[in-house]
């Protein structure tokens, strides 16, 4: 509502003309930031007023009070202590509020000196905090990026441009994305905030981003993305004369980069970050994993959105924050280039072959700091002495890490390792700068003082000496004056009216002969004096704290500017340390969990021997149980495995396991298997599980069909598709028909690798006429009414699903199970002979499913039946029933 008002209407609503000067100042700033919650600094508190106060009180759970009246209207107010601001910001950001921080730009004393005792302290917004522009450690996850993204859709709509930046680490990237892959790319990045043109507010894209991905969108007017404006912003930001300095980029990429930089400028005010030139990447360099597949495979989060139980949590044994973020990025973006994959695998293999080095490096890495985020805080004037000390300690540790390599290999390191550790040599100039200037006990807050070493600057030493030894200097001056006057009872005292003064008894007044003693006050029994020397000392003592803090801030800013000059090197060092952490992590888990180096080919191989699901395996190990490994042998000649078998037997685990092995392999890690030979996978798609999407008004079946449709539309020959129970949620005939046609399409049109699990046993006959499709099932052992799931994948087809056994295991009442057995028996009797012939009996009307009778299958069934018959033990009635049964088989 407020956003739709003009300035005059706003002033009228809030009785602006009769408001106090301070409240007018608040309203002026609020009117300029109507889309934000305004936190207004007043002394030791950040206050909120009017509607902001009511909203913040509810969200933060803090008391709502009043600050007098504005005209006839009472002013609602609430506040939070300035030192606890981050705690409250966390809640506001989690609730997706945009927060404007309004600070005091001068002290009350400075305001009085400027405009008298009625002067209002100057205030202004120093930054606007949004989910995508956070840099505070306490407000963002340490082990994952915090992206702000700008999405620009050109008029042809074939290719979109996406620029994303992590302000906390100064990473900035731009990429062109096919229009059909926009949601998948956003799912990969998981940006905290997306900038989008107002013209797209009602588009299907915006609807999908919000409803399917649940990402925050910040809309901007269309002119925000104007090409000429964005080009100028880029040139000014990077101090370039030609846009080609960025590289070969399209017009829409210019708009994406420029709009991101403009948004950072608007939110960060004067503290614009020092960002490197945007890195231009190729969308096809990374494996495509759509948002539903990421959810189904639980790659970086589990189904509830937490990291616990995800693939990331299983593989993450990194020991640094930046290493954790790099692993997160690796898992989100598996490679598709064989050379780059093998390069990573060679690094992993080197460390796997040098586990003693790995052990030493991991211990040393624990002593390093997150210098990426330290550097960002320094460049944005939000750092503390602790950040500089963190850089110093990390530089020191980096050189020790390099010595570990040198001690083991001398100058004979492989080139790919030498390249990683090159930045570890350190920077003596930078190290010495910090070592000589910053105290080891430097506080977090610059306003506390005590950051700069005393010996670095003589004035700092002098001021601290005054602060620490002020009383001693007063005592020395007192002793001096006693000697000069001969008055042993002379004292130097203090009160709030005249400050420091020399105090003597009235009877000694005749001894004060030197004119330097200036009379200040006479009481009944005492006379008080001062001197120029005492006044100077008093002034120095009173101002020492303020002066030293001001001087230290000035010196600190100069030191930070020198550190910023080393930003490129520090980013390389951070990259080196995070890379070491990730590859040592890969070597560690390969050794700890018996992983093997995969081999990559350029064909359709997917040959996994004794593969395991890493997450399930780890969960079973906690229960002292073993995981049952399985093979998977897909190839050009056997591209599709049709898997049938009982519920709870492990079909879904097997499907997920192989998709996960492909992902792990293509990030450069060893994999949970005895051996693995993989043709590079360009895209992974999964259709696993069932859930109604009530928010979008979609049934389970509709959601499934939409996902399946997207898979068939986007897959290529090099993709890996895993499908579980396609076609359920509708009638049996409809479901079988859909599953059948999907399988045919994958086999004949896409010709890609596919694992297809189903309870439609009718589909198994497709192996008779689809040469690249083979039947597999899950081995079980039956003992009377009991079954044992062996979890082994074996060649063949299941003829039943054992649903009643699973129902019994789930605890259904025995009477229900018994009744279900009776009904099942009746169904089986009335449908004997129809089961796998349902489709073929309809074949005259549906040519899609027309099958030639399979004599081999019939013969095998007859053989199986005859092998169980003992003619000598058949009664006449049993023999007659057998004849009818055999006739149905034929």
Swiss-Prot record:
Does this entry carry the keyword DNA damage?
yes
The residues listed in the UniProt record as binding ATP, with positions renumbered to this chain, are: 645-652
Per UniProt, what is one Pfam family of this protein? Answer: MutS_III
- Give the keywords, sorted: ATP-binding, DNA damage, DNA repair, DNA-binding, Nucleotide-binding
The answer, when asked if Signal is one of the entry's keywords, is: no
What SUPFAM superfamilies does the annotation carry?
A: DNA repair protein MutS, domain I, DNA repair protein MutS, domain II, DNA repair protein MutS, domain III, P-loop containing nucleoside triphosphate hydrolases
GO MF annotation: an example: ATP-dependent DNA damage sensor activity
Q: Which domain of life is it from?
A: Bacteria
Q: Which Gene3D superfamilies match?
A: 1.10.1420.10, 6.10.140.430, DNA repair protein MutS, domain I, MutS, connector domain, P-loop containing nucleotide triphosphate hydrolases
A Gene Ontology annotation in the biological process aspect, one of them, is: mismatch repair
UniProt lists the family membership as follows:
Belongs to the DNA mismatch repair MutS family.
Cross-referenced HAMAP family, in alphabetical order? Answer: MutS
Role played = This protein is involved in the repair of mismatches in DNA. It is possible that it carries out the mismatch recognition step. This protein has a weak ATPase activity.
Q: What is this protein called?
A: DNA mismatch repair protein MutS
Per the record, the gene is mutS
């Amino acid at each position: 509502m407020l956003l739709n008002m003009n300035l005059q209407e706003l002033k009228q609503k809030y009785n602006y003309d009769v408001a106090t000067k301070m409240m007018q100042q608040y309203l002026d700033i609020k009117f300029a930031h109507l889309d934000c919650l305004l936190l207004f600094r007043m002394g030791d508190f950040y206050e909120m007023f009017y509607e902001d106060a009511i909203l913040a009180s509810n969200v933060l759970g803090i008391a709502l009070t009043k600050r007098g009246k504005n005209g006839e209207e009472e002013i609602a107010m609430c506040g939070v202590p300035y030192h606890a601001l981050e705690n409250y910001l966390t809640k506001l950001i989690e609730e997706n509020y945009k927060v404007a921080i309004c600070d005091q730009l001068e002290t009350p004393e400075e305001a009085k000196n400027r405009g008298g005792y009625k002067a209002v302290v100057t205030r202004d917004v120093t930054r606007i905090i949004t989910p995508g522009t956070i840099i505070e450690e306490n407000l963002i996850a340490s082990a994952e990026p915090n992206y702000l993204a700008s999405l620009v859709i050109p008029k042809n709509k074939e290719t979109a441009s996406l620029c994303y930046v992590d302000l906390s680490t100064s990473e900035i990237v731009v990429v062109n994305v096919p229009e059909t892959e926009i949601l998948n790319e956003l799912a990969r990045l998981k940006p905290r905030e997306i900038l989008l043109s107002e013209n797209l507010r009602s588009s299907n894209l915006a609807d999908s981003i919000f409803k399917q991905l649940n990402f925050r969108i910040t809309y901007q007017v269309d002119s925000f993305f104007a090409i000429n404006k964005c080009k100028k912003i880029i040139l000014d930001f990077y101090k370039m004369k030609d846009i080609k300095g960025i590289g070969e980029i399209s017009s829409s990429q210019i708009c994406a980069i420029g709009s991101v930089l403009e948004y950072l400028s608007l939110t960060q005010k004067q503290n614009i970050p020092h960002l490197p030139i945007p890195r231009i990447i190729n969308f096809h360099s990374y494996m495509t994993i759509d948002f539903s597949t990421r959810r189904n495979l639980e790659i970086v989060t589990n189904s509830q959105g937490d990291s616990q139980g995800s693939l990331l949590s299983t593989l993450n044994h990194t020991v640094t924050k930046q290493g954790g973020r790099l692993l997160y990025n690796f898992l989100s973006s598996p490679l598709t280039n064989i050379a780059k994959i093998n390069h990573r695998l060679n690094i992993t293999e080197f460390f796997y072959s040098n586990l003693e080095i790995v052990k030493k490096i991991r211990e040393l890495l624990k002593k390093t700091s997150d210098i990426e985020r330290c550097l960002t805080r320094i460049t944005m004037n939000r750092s503390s002495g602790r950040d500089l000390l963190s850089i110093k300690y990390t530089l020191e540790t980096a050189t020790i890490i390099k010595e570990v390599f040198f001690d083991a290999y001398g100058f004979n390191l492989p080139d790919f390792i030498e390249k990683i550790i090159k930045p570890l040599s350190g920077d003596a100039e930078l190290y010495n700068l910090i070592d000589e200037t910053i105290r080891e006990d430097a506080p977090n807050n610059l306003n506390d003082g005590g950051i700069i070493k005393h010996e670095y600057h003589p004035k700092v030493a002098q001021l601290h000496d005054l602060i620490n030894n002020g009383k001693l200097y007063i005592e020395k001056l007192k002793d001096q004056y006693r000697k000069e006057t001969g008055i042993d009872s002379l004292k130097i005292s203090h009160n709030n009216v005249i400050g420091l003064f020399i105090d003597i008894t009235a009877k000694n007044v005749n001894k004060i002969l030197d004119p330097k003693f200036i009379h200040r006050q006479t009481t009944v029994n005492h006379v008080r004096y001062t001197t120029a020397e005492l006044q100077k000392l008093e002034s120095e003592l009173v101002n020492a704290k303020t002066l030293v803090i001001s001087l230290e801030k000035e010196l600190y800013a100069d030191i930070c500017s020198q550190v910023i000059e080393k930003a490129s090197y520090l980013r390389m060092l951070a990259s080196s340390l995070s890379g070491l952490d990730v590859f040592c992590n890969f070597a560690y888990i390969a050794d700890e969990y018996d992983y093997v180096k995969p081999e990559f080919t350029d064909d359709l191989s997917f040959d996994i021997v004794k593969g395991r699901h890493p997450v399930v395996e780890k969960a079973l190990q906690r229960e002292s149980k073993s995981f049952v490994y399985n093979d998977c042998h897909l190839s050009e000649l056997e591209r599709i495995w049709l898997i049938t078998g009982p519920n709870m037997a492990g079909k879904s685990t097997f499907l997920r396991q192989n998709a996960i092995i492909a992902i792990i392999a293509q990030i450069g890690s060893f994999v949970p298997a005895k051996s693995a030979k993989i043709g590079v996978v360009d895209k992974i798609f999964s259709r696993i599980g069932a859930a109604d999407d009530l928010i979008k008004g979609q049934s389970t079946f509709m959601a499934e069909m939409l996902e399946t449709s997207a898979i068939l539309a986007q897959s290529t020959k090099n993709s890996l598709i895993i499908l579980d129970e396609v076609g359920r949620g509708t009638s049996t005939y409809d479901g079988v028909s859909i599953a059948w046609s999907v399988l045919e399409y994958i086999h004949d049109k896409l010709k890609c690798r596919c694992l297809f699990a189903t309870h439609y046993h009718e589909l198994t006959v497709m192996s008779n006429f689809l040469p690249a499709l083979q039947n597999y099932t899950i081995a079980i052992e039956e003992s009377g009414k009991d079954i044992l799931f062996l979890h082994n994948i074996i060649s063949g087809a299941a003829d039943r699903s054992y649903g009643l056994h699973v129902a019994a295991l789930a605890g259904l009442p025995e009477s229900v199970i018994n009744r279900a057995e009776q009904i099942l028996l009746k169904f089986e009797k009335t449908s004997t002979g129809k089961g796998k012939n349902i489709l073929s009996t309809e074949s005259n009307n549906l040519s899609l499913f027309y099958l030639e009778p399979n004599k081999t299958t019939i013969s095998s069934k007859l053989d199986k039946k005859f092998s169980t018959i003992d003619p000598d033990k058949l009664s006449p009635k049993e023999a007659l029933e057998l004849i009818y049964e055999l006739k149905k088989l034929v």
